[in-house]
Amino acid sequence: MVKKVLLINGPNLNLLGTREPEKYGTTSLSDIEQAAIEQAKLKNNDSEVLVFQSNTEGFIIDRIHEAKRQGVGFVVINAGAYTHTSVGIRDALLGTAIPFIEVHITNVHQREPFRHQSYLSDKAVAVICGLGVYGYTAAIEYALNY
């Protein structure tokens, strides 16, 4: 059972709750993060969810590297737009060998064609998309039981 899970959110996800609510809903990133932290506490007192958000690719890569040093056992990542562009984030995840789940609030396959390509999916333990913010809950549950 994993004790430490890192929840990473990429660019523009800090705007959740106000950004295109018809697509992303009205739940804020802070609410998602707090729910994930509470979910871990309810699951097991020894478990914890660490949270991180950045609009900057390099900061996300640095945080993945730091996760390895911290003994993080699983990453849940919504890389946002970097999903479709970042070889660097892919390489950081592979380089640290921390298992991960890719999460998207919307069903990216029902959106613009450029969103159909993911640099992460083929290496992810699982991909969750289109379940709204519940996708985070499902991913955290899986990660804590990994």
Curated annotation (Swiss-Prot):
**Molecular function (GO) terms listed?**
3-dehydroquinate dehydratase activity
Residues flagged as site, Transition state stabilizer: 19
Q: Which GO terms describe its biological process?
A: 3,4-dihydroxybenzoate biosynthetic process; quinate catabolic process
List the CDD domains: DHQase_II (cd00466)
User: Is Lyase among this UniProt entry's keywords?
Assistant: yes
Top-level taxon: Eukaryota
Catalytic residue positions: 24 (proton acceptor), 104 (proton donor)
Task: Note the Gene3D superfamilies from the entry.
Answer: Dehydroquinase, class II
EC number from the UniProt entry? 4.2.1.10
Q: Which NCBIfam families match?
A: aroQ, PRK05395.1-1, PRK05395.1-2, PRK05395.1-3, PRK05395.1-4
Question: What name does this protein carry?
Answer: Catabolic 3-dehydroquinase
Specify the species.
Answer: Candida albicans (strain SC5314 / ATCC MYA-2876)
